[in-house]
């Protein structure tokens, strides 16, 4: 969908398309005395569930089953046990609580069921990335985010539908970045033609790991940014969106130096003067203002 568009997607997933054929063969192999007795399928998006597995009625969707909330990722107890082991063998430079305090805001707070709010999970890939740097070098990595876990912006470009008005989905990302959370519902399946609808866009952000379940509000699920790693990703998506739509552009190296000067030396005025001058120069961006 993101790379080659709807027509190619439909050829794969409808009629005699390869993807649908593959799932039909799985069903055939698991029926009666077929060779497949058990299967566990991961990475199946809600779009796949609707468009490909409509006849695949031999399985159960466990995505939001609280019994499987901890199947992938590390609980805090598991992270502490791991750190305690390295501390006992003199490989951990800091104290366990100190290291947890560094990792938690960046890697924790994933929840996949409203009944598992007491059991937030750490992203295991990011925890191992951190330890792979921290243990041998005895210091926190300069970059807390592993580039391998970044969701490809091109996967969202198709859904944001960038144009001169930016589209509603880009506004949803902007609102989520501003407030840190949004109200939504989670569906296990919806068709590709409904993919770009605002409600489904929120659901897809959840399935991409960019939102997580924080609780309930007004009878709906409260979806929130889980940690600083994801917040940084969403900021970068907004920057890419503005650049791609040619609505607003900034010289990022210059802005970075101005922000650093504000942070370390208290020179706040040049930052806002730069913003003001660019807003004036790029006067066609009323949506941004």
What role is predicted for each listed range?
Residues 1-12:
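Conserved P-loop NTPase "ATPase switch" module shared by AAA+ and STAND
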Residues 11-37:
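Substrate-engagement module of ASCE P-loop NTPases
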Residues 35-38, 59-62, 66:
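Short glycine-/polar-rich loops that comprise or flank the Walker A/P-loop
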Residues 59, 121-289:
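Extended alpha-helical interface modules used as scaffolds for assembling large macromolecular complexes
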Residues 2-4, 32, 46-52, 213, ...:
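Flexible loop/turn segments at secondary-structure boundaries
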Residues 46-54, 62-132, 175:
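Amphipathic alpha-helical segments of the small helical/lid subdomains adjacent to P-loop NTPase cores
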Residues 11-19, 75, 201, 289:
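Phosphate/oxyanion-binding active-site loops and adjacent basic polyanion-contact surfaces
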